[in-house]
Amino acid sequence: LDYQDAVVVSDTSFTLYNDSAKELAQRQHSFSSPVLRTDGSLAVVYHQEGTGIRIESASETLTSRNLEQKIISASVSSSGVYAALTQSKNYLGELTVYLSDDTEKYKYYFSEWYPVDISLSADGTWGAVTGIAAQDGTVKSVVYIFDFNQEEPKAKFEFSDNLLLSIRCLESGNVAAIGNRGASIMIPAAQEKIDYDYQGKTLSTFQLDPYYGMVLALAQSEDGRNCTVVRIDNQGKTAMEYPVARKVTSIGYNNGVAGILSSGRIYTYSDLGEETGAYDAGNDAKKILLYSNSQAYVLGVSEIRQVFFS
């Protein structure tokens, strides 16, 4: 996959488009509840709560198989290594890591936390897993950091009263996690984490990126209006933070430009919080993805469109 390609999965097929909207590939699958995740040149498509999993490149399906247990989450690396979190007969869940030839590289059984999500590093040598557990009426979350050449996790970070929603391994070697009450950058080498508390604001939308870290839209109220836009870089530094007097339904960031989707329009901002443009995205726009600092893909109800920033 090229960084400008658009990849779409429906309930029947995996489809790849180039940046001029030309269809490059369409491959059928049989998953009733497919989930798509990409990393660099590869994509993984798996059957949520099913056993089917596929690894796709731009030119071909590299792997198509059924695992022994139902899949909770999966991730693929640019190197071809892929991993799956699955249910387990005797434990709360299992992590299995596979090499590009489908041979098993690593196995871990979870006995204290229910595994929820996984992210692999670009080279596939390490990864991060989120888990949840209930304690005294509250939900606790955990992040395990794995080196797949070591039997046990090399780091473990616990979170009280913060339900982790998504996780991403970063190019810096750190890990980003987004929760419903706060976000964190974990630094495994130092066994420390840097937390950003939402201070009672509501998480409206977010984006995780292996190079730029995370960008968040935090609303003052549950209706999503009057947001604060925050970017935390891959070292845990708050790189930008500014108010936006709009309801933000999707957000993206690329090379100094933040884009927010609000009421069918994309508004762009500099790192200083200055509005630099407004562009029509269509009334059916649901989500945006900035694939450069001058271009975005827009996901509509029945199509994907491009928007160019002047």
Predicted regions and their residues:
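Non-cytosolic head/periplasmic domains of membrane-anchored proteins
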Residues: 22-131, 137
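A short beta-strand motif characteristic of beta-propeller blades
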Residues: 20-28, 59-66, 103-109, 151-158, ...
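Hydrophobic beta-strand positions that form the internal "hydrophobic ladder"
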Residues: 6, 43, 80-83, 124-127, ...
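Structural motif
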Residues: 13-15, 51-55, 90-96, 135-146, ...
